[in-house]
């Protein structure tokens, strides 16, 4: 099962908006995730954000570049950035996203496609 987690072992049910960029050479890329009101910020949650973990049957992709957005002193949103430094890392990320999208009933579309 493909999951996104902010605290190890705790799946985040909120589906993010994901923006991808890739270098012209294809050697590197960036995925920026935006989570609006993620469940980890619920008042019942005592879990701490320790990073963003993309977990599936192949293993785990991790980033610690995770920022919270605060309004009136209350955490509301999360932005996480995953940098891929090789074509292999990009391919691995895309395999995760295909699994995640399929399980969540989402579709992937590239910019410029109709």
From Swiss-Prot:
Keyword set includes Lipoprotein: no
Protein keywords: Membrane, Photosynthesis, Photosystem II, Thylakoid
Bridged cysteine pairs (disulfide): none
BP-aspect Gene Ontology terms: photosynthesis
Top-level taxon in the UniProt lineage: Bacteria
InterPro entries the UniProt entry points to: Psb28_c1_sf, PSII_Psb28_class-1
Pfam families per record: Psb28
Mode of membrane association: Peripheral membrane protein
Signal sequence extent: none
Xref: HAMAP family: PSII_Psb28
Assembly and oligomerization: Part of the photosystem II complex.
Protein name listed in UniProt: Photosystem II reaction center Psb28 protein
Organism: Rippkaea orientalis (strain PCC 8801 / RF-1)
């Amino acid at each position: 099962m493909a999951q996104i987690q902010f605290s190890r072992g705790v799946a985040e049910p909120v589906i993010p908006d994901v923006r991808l960029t890739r270098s012209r050479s294809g050697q590197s890329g960036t995925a920026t995730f935006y989570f609006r009101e993620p469940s980890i910020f619920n008042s019942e949650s005592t879990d701490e954000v320790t990073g963003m973990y993309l977990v599936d049957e192949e293993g785990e992709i991790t980033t610690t570049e995770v920022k919270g957005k605060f309004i009136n002193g209350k955490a509301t949103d999360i932005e996480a950035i995953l940098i891929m430094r090789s074509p292999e890392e990009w391919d691995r990320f895309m395999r995760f996203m295909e699994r995640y999208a399929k399980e969540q009933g989402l579709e992937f579309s590239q910019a410029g496609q109709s």
